Amino acid sequence: MHSDATLHILTQFKTYQQTTEYTCGAASSLMVLNWFGQAQYHENAVATLLETHCTKGSSVENIADLFDLIGWNVEYHASEHPKFQTVEEAEQAIIRYIDRGIPIMVDWVDWAGHWQVLIGIDTCGTDNPYDDVLIFADPYDVTDHKQDGYYTFPLGRFFGMWREGPCAEKENPYRQPFVVAHPK
């Protein structure tokens, strides 16, 4: 699959399946490391560096800190307030990152809190972002009878569900948590 006028995608993004129920953040980080050619890392080591907790998983801050520690450019959002006020703003930001070859790690309410890597968006040739389809590298791809690590979801629905899940155990969970990291 390659980008075209409506499809923006990281071609040949390799997926990875997490080995525990709680290391989706580590597995997502590992996929981003691998995307940029950093294949020396392993899921368990990354989980340790992220201080991954067996019920809470990995935090936005710890994932951002890991990439900062290895000297990468890092942008992240960890706030009770949304970064993007409209679905259109989110759509344009996603397109900008993907078109630059940069995946976006997102944490959302799927599975009561789950990290995935956003690797593509199809605008379906319309100006309406509510018909856009997001393409994820999902480290816990167990729902479509084809465990290839790829998952699609409508942007409009995702935008409304883009917040930390109950497993974060916060009274005021982050809204639109994400980490973008790439080598300097």
What positions do the PLM features span?
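Noncatalytic regulatory segments and standalone regulatory/sensor domains
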Residues: 1-2, 52-54, 121-184
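Cysteine-nucleophile protease catalytic domains, especially the papain-like/related folds used
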Residues: 2-84, 165-184
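N-terminal start-of-chain detector that recognizes signal peptides
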Residues: 3-5, 77-79, 87-93, 149-153
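Residues that form generic nucleotide/phosphate-binding pockets
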Residues: 49, 66, 93, 97, ...
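Short flexible/disordered coil segments
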Residues: 70, 76-79, 106-116, 142-152
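Active-site-adjacent substructure of cysteine-protease-like catalytic cores
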Residues: 81-138
